[in-house]
């Protein structure tokens, strides 16, 4: 059996060094009343409020899909036929420059997200696009340190594939997302770092990114409350449930049954609150950060 040390090509050492330093606190510590964190009582009420299904959009295996989600709606990403990784992009529907910012979300909450975490938008807006209100996998954490709903990695793309393998291959989440958003006037340049929904990932002892087989079943869901009018795009990853994925120098044919057979559809279910007035009592639409400085730039003196 091949040892991890034989596979590692990393600048990082697996051994820990002790400097007798105190354990560090999180960079963004959840102080009471902080604007960074969701009001759990409010969002629990929203999650449990009566709602009606107003749309269901199926994303076929190895394809992409984009859907407009109105503000104050609830949407669920589901795996109707079993385990399947989902790559998620989100934009403000009216201003695609405001889009999901994986790195800041990771700093504010954690590298893997779950119920009551929020997915934050880019600068200069910096406000929640969605608040997560339901997660059937509930912060799953396994023996190898793998956790679910990942902001560490990003989408698979044809450029890294070509760089590694020398072959052109369109079967990637980046390409799926690009095609999905074109009807909305967006392009490849609008595709951004994703949230890998239902994907279990982590960092090994060499600080290297790893992925595990998707644990989701047909009963699992990832549910969000839309804080703004949104464009939501998903890709049913061509790696399927990641049990037989492979791209690169030693990859198998991506059209082979080994990969195709582990690919399944996704769906987005959109819900409308039946009693919006009572369900949203206390909810305030998020505002952009009112930074009035000028980045240290000064007007020329007269």
From Swiss-Prot:
Residues 1-24 are annotated as: Disordered. It comes from the Eukaryota. One of its GO terms (molecular function) is catalytic activity. The lineage of its organism: Eukaryota, Fungi, Dikarya, Ascomycota, Taphrinomycotina. This is Uncharacterized protein C11D3.03c. Pfam families: DUF1989. It comes from Schizosaccharomyces pombe (strain 972 / ATCC 24843) (Fission yeast).
């Amino acid at each position: 059996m091949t040892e991890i040390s034989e596979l590692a090509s990393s600048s990082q050492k697996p051994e820990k060094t002790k400097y007798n330093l105190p354990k560090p606190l999180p960079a963004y510590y959840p102080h009471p009343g902080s604007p960074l964190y969701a009001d759990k009582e409010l969002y629990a009420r929203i999650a449990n409020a009566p709602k009606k299904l107003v749309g269901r959009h199926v994303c076929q295996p190895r394809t992409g899909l984009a859907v407009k989600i109105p503000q104050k709606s609830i949407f669920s990403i589901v795996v109707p036929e079993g385990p399947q990784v989902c790559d998620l992009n989100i934009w403000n529907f009216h201003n695609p420059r405001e889009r999901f910012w994986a790195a800041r979300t990771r700093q504010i909450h954690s590298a893997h997200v779950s119920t009551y975490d929020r997915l934050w938008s880019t600068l200069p807006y910096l406000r929640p696009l969605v608040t997560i209100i339901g997660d059937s996998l509930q912060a799953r954490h396994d023996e190898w340190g793998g956790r679910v709903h990942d902001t560490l990695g990003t989408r698979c793309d044809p450029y890294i594939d070509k760089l590694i393998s020398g072959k052109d291959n369109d079967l990637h989440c980046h390409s799926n997302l690009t095609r999905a958003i074109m009807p909305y006037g967006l392009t490849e340049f609008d595709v951004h770092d994703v949230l890998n929904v239902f994907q279990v990932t982590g960092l090994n002892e060499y600080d290297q990114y790893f992925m595990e087989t998707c644990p989701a079943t047909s009963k699992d869901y990832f549910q969000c409350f839309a804080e703004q009018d949104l464009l939501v795009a998903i890709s049913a990853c061509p790696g399927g449930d990641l049990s037989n994925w492979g791209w690169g120098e030693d990859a198998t044919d991506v059209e082979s049954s080994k990969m195709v057979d582990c690919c399944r559809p996704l769906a987005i279910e959109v819900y409308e609150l039946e009693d919006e007035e009572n369900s949203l009592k206390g909810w305030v639409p998020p505002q952009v950060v009112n930074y009035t400085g000028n980045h240290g730039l000064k007007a020329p003196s007269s």
